[in-house]
Amino acid sequence: MKQTIVIVLLAAVAMMACLQMVAAEPLPEAAPAPSPLAEAEALASPIAEALANPEALASPEAGRILSFIKGLAEHLGKK
């Protein structure tokens, strides 16, 4: 009976030591979230490059992008 109690106590101590070691590990640091301005600039830079290049406006994709930009500008009131 005493032997069982000692084994259970040693197991509990070992389990607590393992939990303490796991809890002591630092959490991985998350990358800081980009600011809304930086995110908007990253999204707008390919569009600005396409609008600056007249040959790019001749592509079929440019028509969709241009119509999206015009619709967005109208929606925001920047006609």
UniProtKB/Swiss-Prot annotation:
Propeptide, residue positions: 25-62
Tissues in which the UniProt entry reports expression: Expressed by the venom gland.
GO biological process: defense response to fungus; defense response to Gram-negative bacterium; defense response to Gram-positive bacterium; hemolysis in another organism; innate immune response
Membrane-spanning ranges: none
Main localization (coarse): secreted
UniProt keyword annotation of Signal present: yes
Signal peptide from the UniProt entry: 1-24
Keyword Plastid appears in the UniProt entry: no
One Gene Ontology cellular component: membrane
Keyword set, alphabetical order: Amidation, Antibiotic, Antimicrobial, Cytolysis, Fungicide, Immunity, Innate immunity, Membrane, Repeat, Secreted, Signal, Target cell membrane, Target membrane, Toxin
Compartment annotation: Secreted; Target cell membrane
Modified residues (Leucine amide): L76
AXPX repeats: 24-27, 30-33, 44-47, 52-55, 58-61
GO terms of molecular function: toxin activity
Functional note: Antimicrobial peptide with strong activity against the fungi C.albicans (MIC=6 uM) and B.cinerea (MIC=10 uM), and weaker activity against the Gram-negative bacterium E.coli (MIC=97 uM) and Gram-positive bacterium S.aureus (MIC=97 uM). Shows cytolytic activity against insect cell lines. Has potent hemolytic activity against ovine erythrocytes (80% at 50 uM), but has no hemolytic activity against human erythrocytes. In vivo, peptide injection in the vicinity of the head and thorax of lepidopteran larvae induces feeding disorder that lasts one or two days before recovering.
Protein name per the record: Eumenine mastoparan-OD
Organism this protein belongs to: Orancistrocerus drewseni
Lineage: Eukaryota, Metazoa, Ecdysozoa, Arthropoda, Hexapoda
